[in-house]
Regions:
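Contiguous segments within soluble domain cores/interaction surfaces
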Residues: 13-21, 31-32, 36-75
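Surface-exposed, low-complexity/disordered segments
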Residues: 28, 32, 53, 89-94, ...
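Ligand-binding face of N-terminal immunoglobulin V-set domains in extracellular IgSF glycoproteins
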Residues: 76, 82-90, 96-98
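Periplasmic plug
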Residues: 399-442
């Protein structure tokens, strides 16, 4: 079972209201293998559809008709907003799927309150999976009711008919402050005769009942991820006789902006860590810090999960191959676009580098500023002279001399390498110090959470790739699902036509901007592709006061070769 921690709210003096829901805007509801599902997440209050300040992480799952999850993503929410994507692989068979979005906090509500969207996937490469013609979907209407007055938000185009590779000047204008300060996502995608599921507009979503749930003081609740990702687990006594309460546990997420935390277990041996730094390394290390650490083992809780048996799939929603021409066009387009993906690649948003948690108190030794030595013993003797070591029976500890204390305290220092705690520093004896960029030191008693250390010694390598050989039941090394990296989606530019004249352009998705803001410059203009047809411009989102906004417009791209 997943836990997260089912915690009793017995200390609460009043009821707690779970007032949270998710709206997800997807770029389409029918996909061919090789295409990409793009989506924007809005985390909202159920009551009034304004942004929810509670959760900082959302989850998105794609569930097949056998009610098995085939894709799961963790999405970081910034100001209640997030974005992600999923490349549809050829391993997925043709059929009906359900896209589900939720937060930890929403797991306290019934499954019917999770965001659910029907998705069709067509795999033209698995011809033995053709579905019977009797189950053909009827084409759904693409009409949308605007949720705002025409005078409140205007979608302006320079014209309605374009040639291939022509610039489309699209502007969004509003004089309404609530709308101007809202959050929106914009999709421009080709329409064809392949049947689709009805997309859920923000307007429609706002009319769907979403209940608030009241938890009383005696309820057990799944905790919300208030500050960031929540990593939880349990310390187990291998003999069953060692205490499991108040056991000190450390968490290391190594890397450039590393995370290091220390907590103590509760009466059940449970612990929780919360990650709020921009470090997307999936490799984590959790350790018991105790003289009797070998008496314990560590188990990690599974990710939050939904009961897929409660999901209802629409009847008769299989696609047939009577739409061969359109399916072939889509399949060929995706193949060509994927072949030239290196010329139209999306960019990852640059991550901000954050200083270590101890930065304001540490003394830095940048080793290039000194004569370099190959070994640790030489380096601490000649450079970081405050540090000394003690060895005994294959165990080595580093200590930091504190001139204000005599005699020196026997406790060792906290030793980190790129954020990874080394309780036994024997690995460093044979490590080439030429790989170390700098050493940070703190002299004197230093607290990390509830644990005090006699100083700190932190080694920062050039490549941030230090690997420890230490293992045991009290050291858990594992990989976890991390949030998707935020992308800046590629927007093809034909300002200079000659630059890309020889590159084919078979885009069916002309623009995807998941972060449209009316109160500042946002990318809303775009260029058409070489694919003729009708395209739908679709804007979804919510005004600052929770008013849903759903606007649609159509444009036509003419086949230049036939003009």
């Amino acid at each position: 079972m997943f836990v997260l921690i089912s915690t009793q709210l017995g200390n609460a003096q009043q009821n707690i209201v779970v007032d949270e829901t998710i709206y997800l805007h997807a770029n389409a509801s029918t996909f061919v293998s090789g295409e990409t599902l793009l989506y924007k997440i809005y985390c909202l209050k159920s009551s009034d559809k304004t942004i929810s300040p509670i959760s900082k992480i959302a989850y998105v799952e794609l569930v097949d008709s056998d009610k098995k999850s085939v894709f799961k993503a963790k999405i970081k929410l910034e100001n209640a907003l997030g974005q992600g994507d999923y490349f549809i692989p050829t391993t997925l068979k043709t059929g009906s799927y359900k896209l589900v979005a939720y937060t930890n906090w929403m797991l306290n509500k019934p499954a019917s309150d999770f965001f659910q969207m029907d998705i069709n996937i067509v795999n033209p490469y698995k011809t033995n999976e053709k579905t019977p013609n009797s189950n053909v979907l009827t084409s759904n209407s693409n009409t949308l009711e605007s949720s705002v007055n025409a005078t409140d938000l205007n979608l302006r185009l320079n014209k309605k008919v374009f040639s291939s590779r022509e610039h489309v000047d699209l502007k969004l204008e509003s004089s309404n402050d609530n709308i101007k300060e809202g959050s929106y996502s914009l999709s421009v995608r080709k329409l064809d005769n392949i049947p689709t599921q009805n997309s859920i507009s923000a307007t429609n979503f706002a009319t769907i009942p979403s209940n608030t749930v009241v938890l009383d003081g005696n309820s057990k609740a799944v905790l919300p991820e208030l500050r960031g990702e929540m990593i939880s687990g349990k310390v187990v006594s291998k003999s069953g006789t060692d205490k499991i309460q108040d056991v000190t546990v450390s968490f290391s997420l190594p890397g450039k902006s590393f995370v290091f935390q220390v907590v103590k277990t509760n009466s059940e041996g449970r612990f929780i860590f919360s990650i709020d730094k921009e470090n997307y390394n999936p490799n984590i290390i959790i350790q018991v810090i105790d003289e009797r650490a070998d008496n314990y083992s560590i188990t990690l809780d599974e990710l939050p999960s939904i009961n897929t048996t409660q999901l209802a799939f629409s009847p008769n929603n299989n696609l047939s191959y009577t739409f061969k021409e359109s399916l072939l066009d889509r399949a060929v387009s995706s193949q060509i676009e994927n072949a030239y993906i290196h010329r139209k690649k999306d960019n990852l948003e640059k991550q901000t580098t954050q200083d270590p948690f101890y930065a304001t108190k540490a003394k830095e030794y940048v080793l290039d500023d000194y004569t370099r030595f190959k070994t640790l013993k030489e380096t601490i003797t000649e450079v970081t002279t405050e540090v000394y070591h003690k060895e005994n029976n294959g165990v080595m500890h580093l200590h930091v001399t504190d001139p204000s204390v005599f005699p020196q305290l026997p406790d060792p220092a906290l030793v980190l390498v790129d954020g990874l705690q080394l309780q036994n520093q024997i690995d460093l004896l044979k490590y080439n110090m030429k790989n170390i960029y700098r050493i940070d030191l703190i002299v004197g008693r230093y607290y990390v959470g509830p644990k005090s250390f006699n100083g700190l010694v932190s080694f920062i390598t050039f490549d941030k790739d230090f690997a420890s050989t230490q293992s045991g039941s009290s050291i858990l090394k594992t990989t976890i699902l991390r949030p998707q990296l935020k992308k800046i989606y590629n927007n093809v530019d034909y300002t200079n036509l000659a630059d890309n004249a020889r590159i084919p352009d078979f885009r069916n998705q002309l623009l995807w901007n998941p972060d449209v803001k009316l109160n500042k410059d946002s990318q809303t203009s775009f260029y058409t592709s070489d694919v003729a047809g009708n395209y739908e411009i679709r804007l979804e989102g919510f005004a600052k006061n929770g008013t849903p906004v759903s606007i649609k417009e159509l444009i036509e791209v003419k086949d230049t070769a036939t003009n």
